[in-house]
């Protein structure tokens, strides 16, 4: 199927993950656009996972900061590669961003499910993000597909400027998986 992933499965299974620090460090050796975990776990590297070309593609989240209107302004300008997240029914309550241009292929062994503890305020906000993402899952699918195609196949300058080298990272993910299998 040419679709980025199965729509109904996404709506039912969309959830948060993080990625092992070792794997992120490995990918960053080859691609500087790969986001990374902040030192001392100041902020957890969180995202959602979609399937593409038999890979788990991790799409990282970036948080919205009320005191940083410049970041939101920049994200609005990058609407071709970023999905802005809001509370359902309240576009005046921005919750963060999905960074499609920074998505990375990740082996199953390097994905860590991130359960939500609704006693934590941050996790309550993340639940709102998840609810919103499920409501726009088709938009997420389409944007992920377009970003991948424009960067990996069409070599569109705008997408190449901001996006990870998906084909390179797929090759490195495959090598990493094989390396892990033989250890």
Curated annotation (Swiss-Prot):
Its main location: cytoplasm. It is an enzyme of class 3 (hydrolase). Changing residue 65 to A: Loss of resistance of phage P0008, still has RNase activity. Changing residue 60 to L: Loss of resistance of phage P0008, slightly decreased RNase activity. It is found in: Cytoplasm. One of its GO terms (biological process) is defense response to virus. Forms a triangular heterohexamer with a single 35-nt-long repeat of RNA antitoxin AntiQ. This is Endoribonuclease AbiQ. It comes from Lactococcus lactis subsp. lactis (Streptococcus lactis). The gene is abiQ.
